[in-house]
A protein has these predicted regions:
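A SAM-dependent methyltransferase catalytic signature shared across enzymes that methylate proteins
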Residues: 4, 223-241
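Short, flexible, mixed-charge acidic loops at enzyme active sites
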Residues: 45-48, 194-204, 253-256
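Conserved catalytic loop of SAM-dependent methyltransferase domains
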Residues: 237-269
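Conserved N-terminal segment of class I S-adenosyl-L-methionine
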Residues: 1-150, 154-158, 167-171, 241, ...
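A short glycine-rich, Lys/Arg-flanked "PGG" loop and its adjoining helix->strand segment in the class I
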Residues: 168-183
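Short, glycine-/aromatic-enriched active-site segment of Class I SAM-dependent methyltransferases
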Residues: 186-218, 223-228
Length: 308
């Protein structure tokens, strides 16, 4: 038998390494065998925060707290550029986590409301927000809000769309609780990006470290993210990168997936870099993050959408 070429080897390797996910018609990946919704909800409530999974902690370092506030300031800036500076905002945050974004907008005079499977994140970071939290299944809570004719200027959802069992249904429900001239701000993990695929192909990464069969059914990349919203009746107003930590993976000394002992230092450095950029110029940082997103880079992607 003749030896296969490097390109043929890469194709075979890519097929083998993507055996648990499939690319859908929108262009992003999803699990071939998705978790049962009830089991996923139990995982969120009992493990996700308590075991500090997914980057959530009980006590964040100073640079992380500064980063969260800076990102909230940037998000408000993006939203205000579209909706106007003087508009009184009513905000719904689906998957509100520890409540840092809610607290920012509450401090700015907005009316806020949060939805989350678990109260643990808010309880241990912003307990003053517990009266604004609706705990439980986001589908059921949204249906109740629809029944009560509740509408919002902004519906925010961070790292939720890629974790729910039926993202199409979530977008359809959101469409019914956002005002016609309102916005949807949605952040997802950026997975199976061209950058990640290349690192897998060239051996920099030995496996798909971001694959989470228990709690993460959908894996968005930039194009698939935008296509998915477009197909569900939304217009994209802009996409922005967040968390540029993945660039560390190109250095064997800071490849935090292969060398997890470097992870905390890499995260701390990433926070410091983005905080420094924000301090130099918040507006320029927003523009930089938009350019990074255009190239599909960034550990997370923030999309701003309106209803068509």
């Amino acid at each position: 038998c003749g030896a296969i070429t490097i390109e043929e080897y890469r194709v075979v390797k890519e097929i083998n390494m993507l055996d648990k996910v499939k690319k859908n018609k929108y262009g992003f990946y999803e699990l071939k065998n998705k978790p049962i919704a009830e089991e996923q909800a139990l995982n969120f409530e009992e493990e996700y925060y308590q075991n500090e999974e997914g980057g959530h902690e009980n006590n964040y370092p100073t640079e992380a707290l500064e980063y969260f506030e800076n990102k909230a300031v940037q998000r408000e800036y993006i939203i205000r550029k579209i909706l106007g500076e003087d508009r009184k905002l009513r905000i719904l945050d689906i998957g509100c986590g520890e409540g840092f974004l809610l607290q920012h907008f509450l401090n700015k005079g907005a009316e806020v409301c949060g939805i989350d499977y678990s109260k643990y994140g808010i309880e241990h970071n912003n307990p003053q927000l517990l009266p604004f939290l609706m705990q439980g299944d986001c589908y059921k809570i949204l249906e109740k809000l629809i029944e009560n004719n509740e509408v919002f200027d902004v519906v925010n959802t961070d790292c939720t769309l890629d974790m729910v069992p039926n993202p199409e249904l979530l977008l359809q429900l959101i469409k019914r609780v956002v005002k016609k001239d309102g916005l949807i701000a949605c952040k997802v993990s950026n997975n199976y990006s061209d950058f990640q695929i290349e690192l897998l192909k060239n051996g920099t990464l030995s496996k798909e470290f971001w694959l989470d069969e228990k709690g993460h059914p959908s894996y968005f990349n930039k194009d698939g993210f935008v296509n998915f919203f477009d197909a569900n009746g939304y217009e994209c107003k802009g996409v922005y990168s967040e968390r540029l930590i993945e660039l560390n993976l190109m250095n064997e000394l800071t490849n935090y997936y292969e060398k997890p002992e470097t992870g905390k230092a890499c995260w701390k450095t990433a926070f410091k870099i983005e905080n420094m950029l924000h301090d130099l110029s918040m507006e320029d940082t927003v523009n930089i993050m938009r350019l990074f997103a255009n190239m599909g880079l960034g550990r997370e992607l923030l999309g701003i959408f309106s209803v068509k």
